[in-house]
Structure formats: C-alpha cells, structure tokens
Amino acid sequence: MSYYQGNDSRKITGGQKGKNRDKRKYELGSPPTETKISDKDIKEKDRVAGGNFKLRLRYASYANVYDPQSKTAKKVKIISVLESPANREYARRGIIVKGTLIQTELGKAKVTSRPGQDGIINALLLRE
C-alpha cells in the first residue's frame, strides 16, 4: 500500500468528491524511518525528489558525540534511549529521533541530527 499525501477524496459531509485527475508520483510519501539500537549500523539508500538520495539509518550502534567543554567529538557506543520529546512510546520502544536523550559510554547526550534523513547520529554531550 502506498502513502498518498494529496487531497482527500471526501467532502466535509462525507460524500465523494469528483475526481478530475489521477494521482501523481510527487504526491506519494514513505513510512517513517524508526531508527533503533542494534549491534551494527544498517543504512538504506532511498531515491527522493529531484533524483537525490537520502541515507536512512534503520539500526544504529554508535553516535558521534560532541563535548562542548573539551571541544572534541568522539565516536561512542549507544547504550540506551532515555527519553524522546517526539513521543513517549519512542523511548520505551528504543527509537531514536532528533532531540532524543540517549545514554552513551561518555554519559547522557542529546541527538542533534535526524537519523532517518541523514543516515548518521550526531549528539551533544550533556553535563549535569
């Protein structure tokens, strides 16, 4: 089943609207990429509008964590998902999105990239 993002074919009253053209390819979408924690990184290459490509990160094991105190970035292992501002269920299911708080080997970090769009997890180390 496709993800159609065009106008609805129903009127406010519930009746069918008249169809004046077919669905177009640019009106199609895709399901959300729900990045989860795993042993290894698994990426998918997805063709998008304009012939461009998006790297969708399906499973992640490492994050690039930036430490603002020492001004250095390190590749560290992700231990768990603590909380997610997008959805409470995401934290329980272990899904990583932008703004998610993750537990890493260095400590707590906040995800600053969009894993489902960028194909990588960048995070900012938080100091308590």
Swiss-Prot record:
<dbReference type="InterPro" id="IPR022309">
    <property type="entry name" value="Ribosomal_Se8/biogenesis_NSA2"/>
</dbReference>
<comment type="similarity">
    <text>Belongs to the eukaryotic ribosomal protein eS8 family.</text>
</comment>
<dbReference type="Pfam" id="PF01201">
    <property type="entry name" value="Ribosomal_S8e"/>
</dbReference>
<dbReference type="InterPro" id="IPR018283">
    <property type="entry name" value="Ribosomal_eS8_CS"/>
</dbReference>
<protein>
    <recommendedName>
        <fullName>Small ribosomal subunit protein eS8</fullName>
    </recommendedName>
</protein>
<keyword id="KW-0689">Ribosomal protein</keyword>
<comment type="subunit">
    <text>Part of the 30S ribosomal subunit.</text>
</comment>
<dbReference type="GO" id="GO:0006412">
    <property type="term" value="P:translation"/>
</dbReference>
<dbReference type="GO" id="GO:0005840">
    <property type="term" value="C:ribosome"/>
</dbReference>
<keyword id="KW-0687">Ribonucleoprotein</keyword>
<dbReference type="InterPro" id="IPR020919">
    <property type="entry name" value="Ribosomal_protein_eS8_arc"/>
</dbReference>
<dbReference type="InterPro" id="IPR001047">
    <property type="entry name" value="Ribosomal_eS8"/>
</dbReference>
<feature type="region of interest" description="Disordered">
    <location>
        <begin position="1"/>
        <end position="41"/>
    </location>
</feature>
<dbReference type="GO" id="GO:1990904">
    <property type="term" value="C:ribonucleoprotein complex"/>
</dbReference>
<dbReference type="GO" id="GO:0003735">
    <property type="term" value="F:structural constituent of ribosome"/>
</dbReference>
